[in-house]
Amino acid sequence: MSRGSRLHRWPLLLLLLLLLPPPPVLPAEARTPAPVNPCCYYPCQHQGICVRFGLDRYQCDCTRTGYSGPNCTIPELWTWLRNSLRPSPSFLHFLLTHGRWFWEFINATFIRDMLMRLVLTARSNLIPSPPTYNIAHDYISWESFSNVSYYTRVLPSVPQDCPTPMGTKGKKQLPDAQLLGRRFLLRRKFIPDPQGTNLMFAFFAQHFTHQFFKTSGKMGPGFTKALGHGVDLGHIYGDNLDRQYQLRLFKDGKLKYQVLDGEMYPPSVEEAPVLMHYPRGILPQSQMAVGQEVFGLLPGLMLYATLWLREHNRVCDLLKAEHPTWGDEQLFQTARLILIGETIKIVIEEYVQQLSGYFLQLKFDPELLFSAQFQYRNRIAMEFNQLYHWHPLMPDSFWVGSQEYSYEQFLFNTSMLTHYGIEALVDAFSRQSAGRIGGGRNIDHHVLHVAVETIKESRELRLQPFNEYRKRFGMRPYMSFQELTGEKEMAAELEELYGDIDALEFYPGLLLEKCHPNSIFGESMIEIGAPFSLKGLLGNPICSPEYWKPSTFGGEMGFNMVKTATLKKLVCLNTKTCPYVSFRVPDPHQDGGPGVERPSTEL
């Protein structure tokens, strides 16, 4: 064939190619789907760890879980026996909240110590120590252990490449957070806590937890500014050395203060130039300076700040009398340790006691754990931070005597504390009921936005579904929304929005769960919250064998102050008169006495 004839055929071939129909395009559903990350199914049970291999394979690490098998579901003999004998959380709660006469007998015997040791070890063992994951690392890493700027997390985040926001269950898009707030969390009518919890408790909860819940606004919700990760009283002394120094008097170990109408109060920002969050227009001399920058928000928070300031300076006077050769620094540091001990004592024996509703009398005794394996170190978890948004406690308005204060009148009220005085506010807050936390629809509209932001934050943190946390803390997952809520109306609405009970989010699940009978909240809040709380309290260094001795607290006097601390002592040893003070509203059948009485000499 000649070269010329070949050249003439090329245009013809090109023309034929152009006239051919294009190859058929397969519809999207006919294409080979991308493999789903197998860990999105949460296949590993009983704290097994899911490790992905390749695109569609996984392996469960069942090491030391007590289970074996591909998904850690086959119990070992000892595990099977233990599970067979272990009562359910609901049965244990019933047992601990019924039969008062039986528990009065137990509380008077050595059995109380045995049960308390069992409670502390069983609860604390549910918290991983050292810490495991954080917002940036869903696997064991040195960064997760060493970088205390992160909150830790108990469960890794939902993998990024899952079919739905909560893994594989539920809808492709989560419900609008504002809609959830309005439908399920907004208060219709104030529901008081049936256990009798009061505002003195509610403000203590806020004041106490703000020493270790200090999310970094600059870094994001997975980071904290409270680098002590526990009860270090940073809300009294500041979370850094510069702030501490601004608040200290540098004389006899004391903190700065001002005297108004013969009473000790925190200094003004003029006297202690630290950052405090007050609205514009409030003069510096009207702003009180304390360890936590947000405590000017509520008079109840500044009430506790004032009480602990007075307590610190009172303890310093007692230590100075016992140790006249001690300098300012040693007096300050020892007083701080005593106040840490007093705080933990009050929290365990009165605060947690009130929350639990147990007839078993809880006991703060670090020596109970000296024979057990226990790590005296703590790391605050983002799940604990999420769980502790207890805004249903807040009432519709605030009463002091016969005077009612709206939120607009109460927030940032800088004169109420000095106008009424500590005693009158303690008495008023101790008599006003707080709201029930669980069960839903009990958050006042003034603070609803905080709950909505909590839901949004949990999505940014990619927290696993509520049922996964129930399994992680030894509870049976709920099978339906009706089982969760105990009623039909909310259950049907939740079903419509989420599509599947296994897609329910962590925080809404905690607040919407049906409460135990006559209780402040439901099973999950107790079973998940208690381990975090007790591990954080008993994991404090002062509870260790090296620290728990008289010399740490300046001798037997300081040691006894820790071991005998009560809420009533905190108030009545730092006021001129002794008001009614408790974490529980008074029994109307027993409370016929005056609102304020003289301090007891036994305090």
From Swiss-Prot:
Its cofactor is heme b. Pathway: Lipid metabolism; prostaglandin biosynthesis. Disulfide bonds join 39-50, 40-162, 44-60, 62-72, 572-578. It is found in: Microsome membrane; Endoplasmic reticulum membrane. The conversion of arachidonate to prostaglandin H2 is a 2 step reaction: a cyclooxygenase (COX) reaction which converts arachidonate to prostaglandin G2 (PGG2) and a peroxidase reaction in which PGG2 is reduced to prostaglandin H2 (PGH2). The cyclooxygenase reaction occurs in a hydrophobic channel in the core of the enzyme. The peroxidase reaction occurs at a heme-containing active site located near the protein surface. The nonsteroidal anti-inflammatory drugs (NSAIDs) binding site corresponds to the cyclooxygenase active site. N-glycosylated. N-linked glycosylation is necessary for enzymatic activity. GO terms for cellular component: cytoplasm; endoplasmic reticulum membrane; neuron projection. It comes from Canis lupus familiaris. The cyclooxygenase activity is inhibited by nonsteroidal anti-inflammatory drugs (NSAIDs) including ibuprofen, flurbiprofen, ketoprofen, naproxen, flurbiprofen, anirolac, fenclofenac and diclofenac. Its main location: membrane. Brain cortex. Isoform 2 is expressed in the cerebral cortex and heart. Residues 1-27 form the signal peptide. Belongs to the prostaglandin G/H synthase family. The keyword Cell inner membrane does not apply. GO terms for molecular function: heme binding; metal ion binding; oxidoreductase activity, acting on single donors with incorporation of molecular oxygen, incorporation of two atoms of oxygen; peroxidase activity; prostaglandin-endoperoxide synthase activity. Glycans are attached at residues 71, 107, 147. This is Prostaglandin G/H synthase 1. One of its GO terms (biological process) is cyclooxygenase pathway. The lineage of its organism: Eukaryota, Metazoa, Chordata, Craniata, Vertebrata.
